[in-house]
Amino acid sequence: MKMRVVGTLLSSPFGKWGVAAILACAIASAVAAPNPVSGPKPSDGGYQTSAAHAILIEADSGSVLFEKSADDLIPPASLSKLMTAEVVFNEIKQGRIKPTDEYIVSTNAWRRGGAPSRTSSMFIPIHSKVAVDDLLHGVIIQSANDASIALAEGISGNESAFAELMTKRAREIGLAKSTFGNSNGLPDPRQLMTARELGKLARHIIETYPEYYKYYGEREFTWNKIRQYNRNPLLALTIGADGLKTGFTKEAGYGLVGSAVQNGLRLIVVVNGLKSEKERADEAKKLLEWGFHNFQSGLLFAA
């Protein structure tokens, strides 16, 4: 039997694992599954963040290290494209579509998500045929709304049906509260998620689709001679970040779901409701650094 846990780095005669190691070993003798360990909460004098909603998760065990209003339903903006991509990943995995399949960019996708929309876009010409894999790159790297709608229409016939599929799929992977009204995250009263479920979704993508998760770490993508850059500011920092997604609408504020690895410890951070791109990047970075500084993951028991 083996057990991996996350412990606070404490000073004690027993070394840096301190009391956490002793307790973990005791638990490991009776329990084989990882035991989530909660870190300090804002209400008890722990870490503070200006994000309205936040959570920090240790990816291997699912341990919650920090949370703030993590179960409030919020408009996720483009963070909901994580669910859009998950549905596409699953369709490929189930053999219902292939990355090389081509979908036509409809007038609707072009008008609502392309150049005329003045939103994040791949700038796909109307009625063009684009491979699923290219559309996925557009959604993941550029947050392209035209690509999101094209995928939705290609898979489900129309965006409303795809949004229903997103909600259904969310339930299948354990997201009990999330609901969707569109594929792109633009304002819709049905488009609601929580910070906790965004973190769960990120963890699911990382664990289930490693061959596609790597797309989230790509710094740029060129299609039709148009080069666009990844919107995730964490990728430019030296903190081990390799994903995932940013989001913004006036209603939602600035949000980010990110992940980084240091010394074998992967953390997932979610922040939302921030006032600027800079504050979003700063708060996500600080929370990750706090996690890496205060927690460590390791194999404590094997038999």
Name these PLM-found stretches.
Residues 33-196, 203-207:
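Active-site-adjacent loops and short helices of periplasmic peptidoglycan-processing enzymes
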Residues 15, 157-158, 249:
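Glycine-centered helix-coil hinge/cap
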Residues 175-179, 187-303:
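Domain-terminus/edge residues, biased toward the C-terminal soluble/receptor-binding domains
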Residues 18, 22-24, 46, 54, ...:
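Residues at the start of alpha-helices and the adjacent loop-to-helix junctions
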Residues 1-53, 96-98, 298-303:
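N-terminal secretory targeting signals
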